[in-house]
Every structure is written in structure tokens, then in C-alpha cells.
């Protein structure tokens, strides 16, 4: 990768955001790290410096556009601009549609979808000037829509749709766009879980813990795919296979999801 090697990462205080920062830090990049978890941010910044990078950390709640604007201004002042923006901050949620409240929906959409929209909006002038890149973190849930997590599915599907829109709109401005859609991997995402169905949280937690893939693995794969110019980045092999099947025979996937929904409902009633 060329450019000036300056990256901003939201949700950098832990998990995937931290590992993305560290992966680019090992290449000598300067990192602007943001999160609502200030203690986690301090840890990430120390790790970034140990890995060979540098930069600064600034608290930022992606629900607040003014905080994102302030972060963009800090990137301008401290780094002279930005080359890659990673909209990674996100939260977990789940529950059957009839049990989810509108407040559950508002919370999920405000962070996982509108946080990405606002991040793109706040940083577009900087990446447009540097002819840089935007990396939005979505999920395989955006493509496969598992039952019992409709608000999460919708938010992440919105991130994919936004990224597709930006891909075509910004090509002429020489701004690259990528969207990352990981499946389950070892992460602390469930610390943020909100939802009315405890059994779904337990089921998802078990899947996360059982995954052989770590956040560092995802970050490594992301680095390689961005370097190759891949738009939709699917780091899990089973995710790539499932997406291919859905494109060829969507009804087969829907039928499978109906069975899965009944299994989840039965477990929630047990």
C-alpha cells in the first residue's frame, strides 16, 4: 500500500478494531484510534507503538456526529489528514421480532448503521483529498439473515448497501471502498449484547467461543484483501460457501433458516 499511511479506526478499544489497528501498525502506519472505552483505547495505543506504529487516541461515540467531526479535525491537525477510514464500531443484539422493542431497534440502528453513515460523512472530505479508502465493517448477518436477530441483520445489511452505493459513487473521485463481512469469530462483541431473549445470547456466545478464527486472523485477511482491491471481503470459508449457495439457490437457504428459527424458538421456550 502506498499513500501517507494514516488510518482512523472506530471501535479500536478492543476486539476486531484493535487487531485491525495492530495489523496496520506493523506496517508502520500512524493510527487515529477512537472508542467510547477510554481505558481500552489507551491499551490499544500502547500496543500500536509496540508493534511499530504511532498515533493518538480520542474518545468518540459514533452516535454523535459532532464527535466524529471533532475526530476528523484532530486527524487533520495531528496527522495532516487521513488515508484509510475504518468504520468498525458496533454492538451485538438479538431476539425474535415479536419480542424486540422499538427501543432495541433504535439503539441497534443508531450505532451499527448510522454510526457508519456518520463516519463516512465526517471523513469523506479527508479521504477524497488523499484519494484514500473507506472500510466499513458489516457482517455475514447482512447477507444470510439468521433468525432471532432481525435488528442486527437489518443494520448490517444497511452497511453493505451503503458500501455498494459509495463504491459506485466514489469511484470517479478516486476513493476506494471495501466492506468486511465476517461470520462468528473469537471476540468480546457479546459484552455489548442487548436483547429480550437470553437463550439467543447464550447460543451466539457459544458460536463465538467455538470459532477457530480470531480477530487477528480477520485483520490479516482484511489487510491482504484490501491490498488486492477486493470490495466485499468474506474472511470465513464457510461464509463464502454459504453466500455462493444463496446466490445460486436462495430458497434453499430460506428453508434452512426456517428450520433454524424453530430450533431457536424451542430452545428459548425450554
What are these regions (language model features)?
Residues 11-15:
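Conserved glycine-rich cofactor-binding loop
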Residues 38-39, 59-70, 102:
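The beta1-alpha1 cofactor-binding region of Rossmann-like NAD(H)/NADP(H)-dependent oxidoreductases
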Residues 96-97, 101-107:
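Substrate-binding pocket helix/loop in short-chain dehydrogenase/reductase
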Residues 98, 146-150:
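Active-site loop immediately N-terminal to the catalytic Tyr-X3-Lys motif
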Residues 120, 155:
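Active-site helix of classical SDR
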Residues 139:
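Residue(s) in the substrate-gating loop at a strand-loop-helix junction
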Residues 172-237:
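SDR active-site lid
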